[in-house]
C-alpha cells in the first residue's frame, strides 16, 4: 500500500470490515412508528454503534411494493416466511476485532433489556453474524465496501444462496467471479456486490429474544447488492443473475429481498409496510 491511496484499488486500503451483523426485524402491527423511533433513536446506537470496533451501521426498509418483489416464495432465510421482515439493519465490524466486538455486544444486549430498553413488540426474522469474504465492483474507481453504509445507497438487495454439491462460500465466490458476477455487474444498477459467509456458532447464541431464521449450513453465503437507484430497478438483473448462478451449477437462491433507505429522523414508510 502506498499513499496517497490509489484510485480503484480498495482491496489495498488499510481499513476493512471483517465481519457483519445483519438483523431483519418485523414490528408488530400497530407499533410501526414506536418501533422505528425506538430503534433509530436508541437501539441503533445503544445496541451497536457505541461499541468499540463497530465501524459503521445503516438501516433500510421494505415497503409493501418491495416485499412483493421478493423471490423465491419458499425459503429458510426468513422466519416465518419470505414475506416477513420490514426493517433491516447492517453493521460493519473492523477486521481482526470480531471477538472483542462480540463480547461487548453480547453483554450489552442483556444490559439493555434488564434496564428496560428493549422493545418486545417486534419479531426477529433473520439476525445473524457473517464473515466478510470480498467485494466486487461495477466501476473502475468504486466506492469501497468499507464506505458502503456511510454512502447512504438508496437501495440494498440481500441475496442468500446455498452452494451446490456442498461447496464452501469461498469456493462458490471464486466460481461466481469467473463469469456470473462480472456479467451481472456490467451495465447494471448494482455498484457493489459484497459477499459474506455466515458465522456458524458451536452452540446457539444466548439472546433475550428469538433471533428468527438460523444462519444456514456451511455452504450458505449472503450477498449484499448496493445501488443508488430505486432497488426495484435492479430486480431484473438479479433475477437473471440468480438463474445464471443455478444454471452454472454454482448455487441455488434461497431468498432475494430488496430494501430502500430509511429517511433518518422521520417516520416515512411506517404506513406502507403492509
Each model region followed by its residue ranges:
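Macromolecular interaction modules
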Residues: 1-274
Amino acid at each position: 500500500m502506498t499513499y496517497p491511496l490509489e484510485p480503484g484499488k480498495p482491496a489495498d486500503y488499510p481499513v476493512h470490515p471483517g465481519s457483519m451483523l445483519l438483523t431483519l426485524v418485523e414490528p408488530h402491527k400497530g407499533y410501526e412508528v414506536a418501533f422505528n423511533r425506538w430503534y433509530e433513536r436508541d437501539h441503533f446506537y445503544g445496541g451497536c454503534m457505541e461499541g468499540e470496533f463497530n465501524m459503521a451501521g445503516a438501516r433500510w426498509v421494505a415497503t409493501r411494493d418491495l416485499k412483493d418483489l421478493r423471490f423465491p416464495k419458499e425459503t429458510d432465510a426468513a422466519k416465518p416466511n419470505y414475506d416477513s421482515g420490514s426493517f433491516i439493519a447492517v453493521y460493519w465490524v473492523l477486521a481482526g476485532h470480531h471477538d472483542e466486538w462480540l463480547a461487548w455486544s453480547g453483554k450489552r444486549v442483556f444490559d439493555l433489556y434488564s434496564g428496560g430498553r428493549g422493545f418486545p413488540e417486534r419479531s426477529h426474522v433473520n439476525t445473524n453474524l457473517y464473515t466478510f469474504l470480498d467485494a466486487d465492483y461495477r466501476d473502475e474507481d468504486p466506492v469501497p465496501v468499507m464506505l458502503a453504509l456511510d454512502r447512504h445507497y438508496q437501495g440494498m438487495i440481500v441475496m442468500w444462496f446455498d452452494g451446490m454439491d456442498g461447496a464452501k462460500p469461498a469456493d462458490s465466490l471464486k466460481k461466481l467471479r469467473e463469469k456470473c458476477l462480472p456479467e451481472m455487474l456490467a451495465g447494471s444498477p448494482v455498484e457493489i456486490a459484497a459477499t459474506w459467509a455466515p458465522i456458524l456458532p458451536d452452540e446457539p447464541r444466548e439472546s433475550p429474544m428469538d433471533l428468527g431464521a438460523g444462519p444456514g449450513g456451511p455452504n450458505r453465503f449472503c450477498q449484499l447488492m448496493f445501488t443508488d437507484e430505486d432497488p426495484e430497478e435492479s430486480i431484473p438483473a438479479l433475477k437473471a443473475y440468480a438463474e445464471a448462478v443455478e444454471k452454472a451449477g454454482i448455487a441455488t437462491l434461497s431468498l432475494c429481498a430488496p430494501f430502500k433507505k430509511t429517511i433518518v429522523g422521520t417516520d416515512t414508510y411506517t404506513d406502507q409496510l403492509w
